[in-house]
Swiss-Prot record:
<dbReference type="InterPro" id="IPR015424">
    <property type="entry name" value="PyrdxlP-dep_Trfase"/>
</dbReference>
<dbReference type="InterPro" id="IPR015421">
    <property type="entry name" value="PyrdxlP-dep_Trfase_major"/>
</dbReference>
<comment type="subunit">
    <text>Homodimer.</text>
</comment>
<feature type="binding site">
    <location>
        <position position="234"/>
    </location>
    <ligand>
        <name>pyridoxal 5'-phosphate</name>
    </ligand>
</feature>
<dbReference type="InterPro" id="IPR004839">
    <property type="entry name" value="Aminotransferase_I/II_large"/>
</dbReference>
<feature type="binding site">
    <location>
        <position position="350"/>
    </location>
    <ligand>
        <name>substrate</name>
    </ligand>
</feature>
<dbReference type="InterPro" id="IPR004723">
    <property type="entry name" value="AONS_Archaea/Proteobacteria"/>
</dbReference>
<keyword id="KW-0808">Transferase</keyword>
<keyword id="KW-0093">Biotin biosynthesis</keyword>
<dbReference type="GO" id="GO:0008710">
    <property type="term" value="F:8-amino-7-oxononanoate synthase activity"/>
</dbReference>
<dbReference type="GO" id="GO:0009102">
    <property type="term" value="P:biotin biosynthetic process"/>
</dbReference>
<keyword id="KW-0663">Pyridoxal phosphate</keyword>
<dbReference type="InterPro" id="IPR050087">
    <property type="entry name" value="AON_synthase_class-II"/>
</dbReference>
<comment type="function">
    <text>Catalyzes the decarboxylative condensation of pimeloyl-[acyl-carrier protein] and L-alanine to produce 8-amino-7-oxononanoate (AON), [acyl-carrier protein], and carbon dioxide.</text>
</comment>
<dbReference type="GO" id="GO:0030170">
    <property type="term" value="F:pyridoxal phosphate binding"/>
</dbReference>
<protein>
    <recommendedName>
        <fullName>8-amino-7-oxononanoate synthase</fullName>
        <ecNumber>2.3.1.47</ecNumber>
    </recommendedName>
</protein>
<feature type="binding site">
    <location>
        <begin position="110"/>
        <end position="111"/>
    </location>
    <ligand>
        <name>pyridoxal 5'-phosphate</name>
    </ligand>
</feature>
Length: 385
C-alpha cells in the first residue's frame, strides 16, 4: 500500500476512535433468537430485526433444506445467464400476487435494490427528492447519480411541496415506509397525493414495514392505501432471511432487467434461499398471530416505560430509547449488558448529532416476562427504579 493511502487509513481510524464512534463486529451465537450468547454468557436480545420471529423458525429451516435438496447450493450465475431458476420465478410471482405488482426484480440486499433503481433510472436534468433521514444506500446513490438531489426535513410535507412546486423537470420522490432508527412512519397518503399533484414518481423503501404493518403484512404502503411506482421490500427483517426485491409495473421491470447493474452483474440469490423466501411469504400472509403478538408487546412496552423521558412512541417494533450524548449512550448500553440485556448504542453518523440512542427492537418471539425484565433493567440503569 502506498504511504498516502496508509496515512489516510490510520488518520481516519484515529479520528473515529477519538470521537468515540469506533464500531466493531462481535462474534455472537444465536443472534437471530431472543436469547443470544457472547463469550460464554447469555443475554436477552433486543437488537435484532427479526420482527416476526421467522429467522430461526423450524418450518422455514425445513423449507431451506428442501430447497437445497431440489436446487443445490449456489445459483452459479447471474439472473440473465443461467442463475434464474423456478425458485426465483415462483418467489417473484408470490411477491407480485401478495403486494399487487406486475414485476418483482430480485437483489442480494436492500442496499443493492435501492441503488440499482436510482443509478439506472436517473439522468442529468432529473430531480431526486429525499427525506433527510433516508437510508445511507439511498443518500449515497443520490449523491453519486447525475440527477440534482434535494433533501427535505424529515416527514415535512410543506418542505416537500415547496421543492416540487419549484421544479418542472422529471422528479422522483424517495422515502422510507418505516424509518429504521426512529421507528416512525412516513405520511405516505399525503406524500402520494403531492406526487400525483406535481406529476412526480414515488419510491418507497419499506424494509421495516413489510411483514409487520397492514393486512396480511403488506406493509406501510398498503396500510396507507398507497401504491408507489417503485416499492422496495427486503428479506432480512420480517422475512427472517436476506435479500430484497424491487416491485414495479412490467415495463419498469423489463427496464431493470436490462439496465440495473446490481441485478445484471451479480450472481443470483441461491435458489434454495429463494425457495425458502416463497415459504416465508406464505407464513407472513397467513400467520396473523405474529403481528398480533407484536402489538401486544408494543402495548406492554408503552405501559412499562411510557412515562420515561427517553421513551419514544411508535406504532412499529422499533423503539428508540433517546439519550443524546454519544458516550452516555455507550455507557447505558454497557450497563444494560452487565444486567443481561443486549442493546446496541446507535451513534453518529448513523443518527444525527446529539441524538444517540439505544435501538430497541421487539420480536414476536419475545415473552411478556422478557419485556418486564427489559423494562426493569432500563429503569434501573437510568436511575428511575
Amino acid at each position: 500500500m502506498t504511504q498516502a493511502f496508509n496515512e489516510r487509513i490510520v488518520q481516519a481510524l484515529k479520528q473515529r476512535r477519538e470521537q468515540g464512534l469506533n464500531r466493531q463486529s462481535e462474534v455472537i451465537f444465536s443472534g437471530n433468537q431472543t436469547v443470544l450468547e457472547h463469550q460464554g454468557k447469555r443475554y436477552l436480545n433486543f437488537s435484532a430485526n427479526d420482527y416476526l420471529g421467522l429467522a430461526n423458525d423450524q418450518s422455514l429451516v425445513r423449507a431451506w433444506q428442501q430447497g437445497l435438496s431440489l436446487y443445490g447450493c449456489g445459483s452459479g450465475a447471474s439472473p440473465l445467464v443461467t442463475g434464474y431458476t423456478p425458485a426465483h420465478s415462483n418467489l417473484a410471482a408470490s411477491l407480485c400476487d401478495w403486494l399487487g405488482y406486475e414485476s418483482a426484480t430480485l437483489f442480494g440486499s436492500g442496499f443493492s435494490a435501492n441503488q440499482a433503481l436510482l443509478f439506472a433510472l436517473l439522468e442529468k436534468g432529473d430531480l431526486l427528492v429525499q427525506d433527510k433521514l433516508n437510508h445511507a444506500s439511498l443518500i449515497e446513490a443520490g449523491l453519486l447519480s447525475p440527477a440534482s438531489m434535494k433533501r427535505f426535513k424529515h416527514n415535512d410535507l410543506q418542505a416537500l411541496d415547496a421543492i416540487l412546486n419549484r421544479s418542472d423537470c422529471p422528479s422522483l420522490v424517495v422515502t422510507e415506509g418505516v424509518f429504521s432508527m426512529d421507528g416512525d412512519c412516513s405520511p405516505l397518503a399525503e406524500m402520494h397525493a403531492l406526487t400525483q399533484r406535481y406529476s412526480a414518481s414515488l419510491m418507497v423503501d419499506d424494509a421495516h414495514g413489510v411483514g409487520v404493518l397492514g393486512e396480511e403484512g403488506r406493509g406501510s404502503c398498503a396500510l396507507a392505501s398507497v401504491k408507489p411506482d417503485f416499492l422496495v421490500v427486503t428479506f432480512g427483517k420480517a422475512f427472517g432471511l436476506s435479500g430484497a426485491a424491487l416491485l414495479t409495473d412490467k415495463s419498469s421491470g423489463d427496464f431493470l432487467a436490462q439496465f440495473a447493474r446490481h441485478h445484471v452483474y451479480s450472481t443470483a440469490l441461491p435458489p434454495a434461499q429463494a425457495f425458502a423466501l416463497t415459504h416465508a411469504v406464505e407464513m407472513i400472509r397467513t400467520q396473523q398471530w405474529r403481528r398480533d403478538k407484536l402489538n401486544e408487546l408494543q402495548t406492554l412496552f408503552a405501559e412499562y416505560l411510557g412515562e420515561h423521558d427517553s421513551f419514544v412512541a411508535t406504532q412499529t417494533p422499533i423503539k428508540p430509547w433517546l439519550i443524546g450524548e454519544t458516550q452516555q449512550a455507550v455507557m447505558v448500553a454497557q450497563r444494560c449488558r452487565e444486567q443481561g440485556i443486549w442493546l446496541t448504542a446507535i451513534r453518529p453518523p448513523t443518527v444525527p448529532q446529539n441524538t444517540a440512542r439505544l435501538r430497541i427492537t421487539l420480536s414476536a418471539n419475545h415473552t411478556k416476562e422478557q419485556m418486564h425484565t427489559l423494562a426493569q433493567v432500563l429503569l434501573t440503569v437510568t436511575g428511575e427504579h
